[in-house]
Curated annotation (Swiss-Prot):
Protein name per Swiss-Prot or TrEMBL: Cysteine--tRNA ligase
Top class in the EC scheme: ligase
Binding site for ATP: 265
Cellular compartments per GO CC: cytosol
Names of required cofactors: Zn(2+)
Lineage: Bacteria, Bacillati, Mycoplasmatota, Mollicutes, Mycoplasmataceae
Extent of motif 'HIGH' region: 26-36
Gene this chain is encoded by: cysS
GO biological process, one term: cysteinyl-tRNA aminoacylation
Listed GO MF terms: ATP binding; cysteine-tRNA ligase activity; zinc ion binding
């Protein structure tokens, strides 16, 4: 399998039997929006596929439950920071479940790792990669200026202009970023440097460093908006501490737009996941994200949502026709995990998750199954529906194509057919209503 690495700007081979993976999690001060869902759906599709190829996954995600935004939210709502973070952590996990996203193997709250965070920062100070200044601690970029910005591609002199950084006259160098900040507001912890809180960029790298035992991980995933400064600053801290790369492959998903406009609070077009799910099929967002390569920007338009709805309508109708066809022809269906269609699916997925071609393959399968039903051809029917079901399952679509039924359903359907044949329409209509309710007609 090959995946596009943002650092080398090339597709890199992934040929391991065990994959260590990290994806940046949410800062839990609000409900997540559909842009936040893109990287976690990307990881879900990737890990489901790798598992289908018998590859073991060790997937870690953080939850940032200490942050200035959480403090402000707590003050505005007259609640504690813990109450805010617990509320939105619960909401985040519920959103994952609603989107049929498998939870990571390990989720770690940043607040649970404060002692380790302080030690990590102290270690960077001890090796002169960071320095303390009046209770604040900053990373010393000048020591690593030959490595810094290799991920984002920015030039240091462009950043120094102040366009991409916050200017702080206290620092040795304007690009030096905060590892520990002295504060008297909100929850704080004691440290070698005094009372304060860790910087956001240190939180993720500490978890990676500790959980994966100071080793380079295979894949780091996140949105393109986090490439700089967050991922850049994660990477440089890991290099400073361990003298090795943080990740072999950096996966970055593209930006989202809503009807050709940037999603932003000022435009009032931010769509929360929980609201999107109430309005649309729970699988719609996944289908939308799969229509284009994950690295590309994506415009979510009314037309694209309409196309998604039509896709699921096709599958619903196909499910009904498939069950009827199986009953009429008394077919025995067994699950098949090997076919030319599944081989083609694997080839597309191996090519940097070429999911747009996968969706085309699914459409071809739907057309072929419909043709077999129309022409009453039962040859290869088992292979066709098994291939379709397998591919949809690996992609993480839930309850979109069902060809299984109980013995009672078969008996009811055959009885209905006989009543229609015998022109006992009143009795047939009663059974027909039952079959419609159960999704057979």
């Amino acid at each position: 399998m090959q995946l596009y690495d943002s650092l080398s700007k090339t597709k890199k081979n992934l040929n391991k039997k065990t994959i260590n993976l990290y994806c940046c999690g949410p800062t839990v001060y609000n409900y997540i929006h559909i842009g936040n869902a893109r990287p976690v759906i990307l990881v879900d599709v990737l890990t489901r596929y790798l598992k289908s190829r018998n590859i073991k996954i060790n997937y870690l995600q953080n939850i940032t439950d200490i942050d200035d935004k959480i403090i402000l939210k707590a003050l505005d709502n007259n609640l504690t920071e813990l109450e805010i973070s617990q509320k939105y952590t619960k909401a985040y996990l519920e959103d994952l479940e609603s989107l049929n996203i498998n939870q990571p193997d390990k989720i770690i709250l940043i607040s649970e790792k404060m002692n380790e965070m302080v030690k990590f920062i102290k270690d960077l100070v001890d090796i002169k990669a960071a320095y303390e200044l009046d209770g604040d601690v900053y990373f010393d970029i000048k020591k690593y200026q030959n490595e810094y910005c290799k991920l984002s591609g920015y030039k240091l002199d462009e950043l120094i202009s102040g366009k991409r950084i916050e200017i702080d006259s206290k620092k040795k160098y304007s690009l030096d970023f905060s590892l520990w900040k002295k504060t008297q507001i909100g929850i704080k912890w004691d440290s070698f440097f005094g009372l304060g809180r860790p910087g956001w960029h240190t939180e993720c790298v500490l978890l990676i460093d500790e959980y994966f035992n100071h080793q380079t991980i295979d894949i780091h995933v996140g949105g393109i908006d986090l490439k700089f400064p967050h991922h850049e600053n994660e990477r440089i801290q890991f290099i400073a501490k361990n003298n090795k790369e943080l990740a072999d492959i950096w996966l970055h998903n593209g930006h989202l737009q809503i009807n050709d406009e940037k999603m932003s609070k000022s435009l009032g077009n931010v769509i929360l996941v929980k609201d999107f799910i109430k309005k649309h099929n729970k699988n719609t967002l996944r289908w939308i994200f799969l229509t284009t390569n994950y690295t590309q920007p994506l415009n979510i338009s009314d037309d694209l949502i309409y196309q998604a709805n039509k896709f699921f309508e096709k599958l619903t109708n196909l499910s009904k026709k498939t069950i009827q066809f199986i009953i009429k022809n008394d077919l025995k269906i067994s699950l098949i995990k090997q076919s030319k269609y599944i081989d083609q699916f694997n080839n597309y997925m191996d090519d940097d998750l070429n999911t747009s071609l996968v969706l085309s393959l699914i459409d071809s399968l739907i057309k072929q199954i419909n043709k077999n039903i129309l022409d009453n051809i039962s040859d290869n029917f088992n292979l066709l529906i098994s291939s379709l079901s397998y591919i949809l399952d690996v992609l993480g679509f839930k309850d979109v194509f069902n060809y299984k039924f109980k013995k009672e359903i078969k008996e009811l359907f055959l009885k209905w057919q006989q009543l229609v044949k015998d022109k006992e329409f009143d009795k047939a209509d009663l059974i027909r209503k039952d079959l419609i309710e159960q999704g057979i007609l």
